[in-house]
Regions:
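Active-site loop and adjoining helix of the penicillin-binding protein/serine DD-peptidase-beta-lactamase fold
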Residues: 330-333, 365
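Substrate-binding/active-site groove segments that recognize
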Residues: 302-329, 341-354, 401-402, 427
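Active-site metal-coordination segments of metallo-dependent hydrolases
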Residues: 259-262, 333-343, 418-419
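Catalytic and binding regions of secreted/periplasmic enzymes and modules that target cell-wall glycans
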Residues: 342-392
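Secretory-pathway/luminal and periplasmic proteins that interact with or process carbohydrate-rich
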Residues: 293-302, 318, 377-389
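Short, functionally critical alpha-helical segments immediately adjacent to catalytic or ligand/cofactor-binding
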Residues: 272, 279-300, 311-312, 346-347, ...
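Cell-wall glycan-active module
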Residues: 2-15, 19-22, 26-27, 37-38, ...
């Protein structure tokens, strides 16, 4: 069963004068073109009438002659030429659309990566260890770039660093440290009121990349959810660990153990809803979210990939939008930062891996291992690890001669990237955890 298809607001690149999806192009194909050029009105109806008359007169030869005359008449020849030209134009338009789409996708990646590189270079004027947000960390700098706040969703730690090159020793140093701790605690408390939508719209890299968030239509979940739940940001000085360095004061605050489970619990309704629509285990969806982002809704990577389930707009995003809308579209970052929309998109991609790419693998557990690995590295790499071939049919044939355990072991032995091996191990382990701890 296909998941519901809610309204989405991605960045879409397509010519306004032509249909762009395969179904739409088919609908604009032979039958429509024939009608447009009069085949049904003149050629087909006329030939039907003549043939019927000929048959009635038992003149089979005559009917063949009539049909031949119809096919070679000036009108029919002109119509056939027009139709051939129409098909050629249609194919040229579709080819041009695909080229425009590929160009737009490539420009999106280049624009994002350049904006990120420029921002890091700017930060290095103040920070020797300049860094930006990633899959498990959300990083924010003050306007003057002399303060840095890092929320680490994997370790449940908030770190505030304040540059203080003039810090000395003795009483002045103590006073500076006291001031830095107070400022750090204030920054931590602010996280409880900083909405996800605000964090996204004010991100310097998004702004530099030319992403306009003035008309972002986010779900109520994104509008209402903050970077950290307010109950976990009310910290005291006693909870802060302070470290003085040559160029800065570092204040670390460890969040309560319940913080991680709280984030998981917030995503559980989404995982259940979309997993049910896709015919998947909600524990699997939760394990993927945990492994991809540690439930960081603002997760991103340099590829770039965005959000809880780390959707890459230019690869997985194409499959997802074609499934949802019948055409490939470029999902924007703000769309994928929305938890609701991201979990739906990620679950659809899991569904496609499990039920399309590896649908002919008979054993359910075997198919699951292949889909998990493919979510990280792509179906082609998984196929090569199983069958030493990029063809999915070859991988399917080999997989159907193996047990699930043998497939798991072969993936762990043959997958080229250590990251993917660790990914498969973590997801399968965490799936069991969510099955047991959350009764999924």
């Amino acid at each position: 069963m296909k998941p519901n298809k809610p309204k989405i607001y991605p960045v879409i690149f397509k010519p306004a004068s032509m249909p762009t999806s395969k179904p739409a192009l088919k609908r604009a194909g032979v039958a429509t073109a024939m009608a447009a050029y009069g085949f049904f009105a003149s050629g087909v109806l006329a030939s039907s009438a003549v043939v019927a008359s000929a048959v009635a007169a038992n003149a089979v030869v005559a009917s063949a002659v009539v049909l031949s005359q119809l096919a070679t008449s000036p009108v029919a020849v002109a119509q056939a030429q027009d139709f051939a030209e129409f098909k050629k134009r249609n194919q040229q338009q579709f080819s041009q659309f695909k080229q425009d789409q590929e160009k737009a996708f490539a420009e999106f990646v280049a624009r994002w990566q350049q904006a990120e590189a420029d921002y890091i270079q700017q930060l290095r004027e103040h920070w020797s260890d300049a860094k930006v947000s990633n899959k498990t960390q959300w990083v924010k700098y003050s306007d003057d770039q002399r303060q840095r706040t890092t929320v680490d969703y994997e370790t449940d730690t908030v770190t505030v660093e304040i540059l203080d090159a003039g810090a000395g020793s003795g009483a002045k140093g103590t006073a500076d440290t006291e001031s830095a701790v107070n400022e750090a605690l204030r920054q931590v408390r602010e996280l409880g009121s900083t909405k996800l939508s605000t964090a996204v719209s004010q991100d310097p890299i998004h702004i530099s990349a030319g992403m306009n968030f003035s008309n972002v239509r986010s779900s109520a979940r994104m509008q209402g959810q903050s970077v950290l739940p307010a109950q976990f940001t009310q910290v005291s000085k006693q909870q802060a660990q302070v470290e003085r360095r040559a160029d800065r004061t570092v204040v670390k605050v460890k969040l309560p153990p319940a913080a991680g489970n709280d984030r998981a619990s917030r995503m559980l309704p989404l995982a259940k809803a979309y997993a049910a629509q896709a015919g998947l285990s909600p524990a699997l969806v939760m394990a993927i979210i945990h492994t991809e982002s540690s439930f960081n809704p603002l997760a991103r990577s340099p590829i770039p990939a965005f959000g809880l389930m780390q959707i890459v707009p230019t690869s997985a995003g194409r499959d997802i939008t074609e499934y949802m809308h019948g055409e490939q579209q470029l999902l924007s970052a703000d769309y994928l930062y929305d938890p609701d929309q991201n979990v739906q998109a990620g679950t659809i991609y899991l569904h496609l891996l499990n039920n399309r790419y590896f649908k002919d693998v008979r054993d359910t557990e075997s198919r699951l291992y292949l889909a998990i690995a493919a979510y990280n590295t792509g179906p082609g790499n998984v196929s090569k690890a199983i069958a030493n071939s990029n063809k999915l049919a070859d991988a399917t044939r080999v997989a159907n001669r193996m047990t699930a355990r043998q497939i798991y072991d072969r993936l762990m032995a043959n997958l080229p990237a250590t990251e993917t091996k660790n990914y498969l191990r973590k997801v399968t382990s965490r799936q069991k955890y969510y099955q047991e701890e959350f009764n999924l």
